[in-house]
Amino acid sequence: MYDIIIVGAGPAGLTAALYALRANKKVLIFEAKAVGGQILLATKVENYPGIEAISGEEYSKNLYNQVKNLGAEFKYETVIRIDENRVVYTNNPENDITYEAKAVIIATGVENRKLNIEGEKDYLGKGVSYCATCDGPFFKNKEVAIVGGGNTALEDAVYLSAIAKKVYLIHRRDTFRGEDMYLKELKKTPNVEFILNSNVTKIEGKDKLESLEITNTNEEVSTLKVDGLFVAVGQSPRNEIFNNVVDIDERGYIISEDGVHTKTKHIYVAGDAREKDLRQLTTAVSDGSIAATVAIREM
């Protein structure tokens, strides 16, 4: 039996592991994809206190090495179920293998929804970004586009309008789902231009992003020259498989009244997987440290 099993090896999960390992606990971490989570997408991290600049990849590598050197055990399997007794089931081909712990921390994070268009993967980190607060400062006095129609897209447009020379807000409809206060502000902002009833259908360039192919609802195609594209079409948490041990809100996030406990004793949540107002690296590591500390205290 493990002391703590952590599901997810992003900043929240790895920080939880760090605190647990320093308390001499036996820790197992499950990761279905790549260690680091969403922060891997960040070209540079410049808003983490005490670190002037670091790539998301380098930050993730450093954090991984830190917990690995302290004795963390990693398994690259997909968790498919957790029961009330903290028995963890995975997609391991040998179905009779399960894992048990005194405490479980769910830190599965979220996935950014993709446009799934030509060039999106090719120019990731070369003009394509899913995080305006992470990468916006690299586009100072440049021209950028944002695609999306919810609050994230509108907030990103407000934020980027103070940094970029020009901001194009592209939306597939003529009305937005986001709040009116953001729209009113954007309509008064001189360097913001709306491109409505349109989709980004292709991303083009050479060594970096140079232009977007835009197709409107009349199937008219045009080219928009920009330096960057911020994709803000939503995020998807991955919590449905845990709904027997946690409560989930209408958007799929884990409900926690105090930000750490779930409805099941000794099963905790940390990071972007839970309902919260701000999803940043700093809030993820904060969640992870709190979850581990509380889990240890309540063992």
Regions found by a protein language model. Give the residues of each.
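A Rossmann-like FAD-binding core segment of flavoenzymes
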Residues: V67-Y89, N95-A101, A162-E257, M299
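Beta1-alpha1 glycine-rich phosphate/pyrophosphate-binding loop at the start
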Residues: Y2-L70, T152-E179, D249, V294
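Phosphate-coordination loops involved in phosphoryl transfer and adenosine-cofactor binding
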Residues: M1-D3, Y76-E77, K140-K142, N197, ...
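Conserved phosphate-binding and hydrolysis motifs of nucleotide-dependent enzymes
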Residues: G8-G13, G109, G148-G150, G271
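FAD-site-proximal beta/loop scaffold in flavoenzymes
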Residues: N116, D122-F138, V233-T283, D287-I290, ...
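Glycine/small-residue-rich loop that forms an oxyanion/phosphate-binding "nest" at active or ligand-binding sites
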Residues: F74-F138, G149
